């Protein structure tokens, strides 16, 4: 089998999986304020230092539903650039500045709680060599979140005032041609002090801490095949003393415009994900098996994502670097 036939076969398999996953979308769910698949498709949501780390403007949409719970997230990021003059007959070229910007609009309904929010992210990228192939970046996200409780579900005795509260995230991120690592914290202000009149229900927000590290291994240059082993550690204030129980190893494989992978969790869960890039458009699917249950006795998590990469038209070889 030649390389072209192999790539066509992979594309057909991905489209088949995508069709099945979309039909299951109505059974999906997301973690409030932190979509389950964001660490795969839009990692800058949990680490603002990643904003602008790619050389194109990207917009992503995540959506999932399950019963009375649902969540939607629209996010985007870009690196600020300026137009510079080319050489001789060459056209003008874009030169990237050190500043990245991004933002998101999100809504999630989980049980009796409903959150609607907006965020703005800023990052500063410091080049670590003259070739500008490795950077150390610092980022911050400022958020405004509007929270309310469904009084029809909690009853009139638990009268709850609708609350608009601020929050922010911080992050630091190193990335080069092969190795990357980052550390971030979200919802730093924690849970707002307001609650219902009987002090029973509180706004479901907690500080979250993320650490990620990974390495890209080139397996085949002619076929643009890259293997990326990595790990993600995610804890909050209540689990920060159990870091060893929250290490999630991740394996990801890139084959030209297609990527897929899997992640393993210490609590027995396992997830699969895949992404395919069309010119300027990318689609992806995320599927997580339930925790230690046999044959879907609990609903699995299924998410679908759609995005736009609004980068200048480049050669095919160059575009394969846009992951």
Locate the predicted segments by residue.
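Subset of outer-membrane beta-barrel
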Residues: 29-323
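Cleavable N-terminal export/targeting peptides
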Residues: 1-32, 309-323
């Amino acid at each position: 089998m030649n390389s072209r036939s192999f790539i066509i076969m992979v594309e057909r398999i991905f489209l088949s999986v995508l069709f099945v996953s979309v039909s299951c979308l109505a059974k999906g769910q997301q973690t409030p304020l932190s979509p389950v698949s964001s660490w795969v498709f839009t990692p800058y949501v949990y680490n603002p230092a990643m904003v602008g780390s790619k050389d194109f403007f990207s917009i992503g949409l995540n959506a999932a539903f399950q019963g009375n719970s649902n969540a939607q997230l629209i996010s985007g990021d870009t690196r600020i650039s300026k137009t510079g003059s080319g050489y001789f007959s060459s056209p003008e070229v874009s030169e990237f500045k050190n500043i990245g910007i991004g933002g998101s609009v999100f809504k999630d309904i989980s049980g009796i709680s409903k959150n609607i929010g907006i965020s703005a992210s800023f990052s500063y990228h410091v080049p670590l060599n003259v070739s500008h192939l490795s950077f150390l970046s610092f980022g911050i996200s400022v958020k405004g979140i509007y929270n309310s409780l469904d009084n029809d579900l909690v009853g009139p005795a638990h009268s709850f005032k609708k609350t608009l509260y601020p929050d922010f995230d911080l992050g630091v991120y190193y990335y080069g041609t092969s190795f990357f690592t980052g550390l971030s914290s979200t919802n730093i202000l924690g849970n707002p002090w307001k609650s219902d009149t009987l002090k029973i229900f509180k706004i479901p927000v907690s500080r979250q801490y993320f650490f990620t590290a990974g390495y890209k291994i080139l397996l085949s240059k002619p076929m643009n095949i890259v293997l990326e082993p990595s790990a993600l550690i995610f804890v909050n204030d209540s689990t920060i003393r159990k870091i060893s129980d929250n290490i999630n190893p991740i394996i990801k494989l890139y084959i030209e415009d297609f990527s897929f992978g899997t992640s393993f969790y210490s609590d027995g869960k396992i997830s699969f994900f895949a992404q395919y890039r069309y010119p300027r458009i990318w689609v992806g699917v995320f599927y997580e098996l339930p925790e230690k249950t046999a044959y879907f006795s609990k609903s699995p998590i299924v998410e679908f994502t759609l995005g736009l990469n609004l980068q200048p038209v480049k050669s095919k070889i160059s575009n394969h670097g846009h992951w």
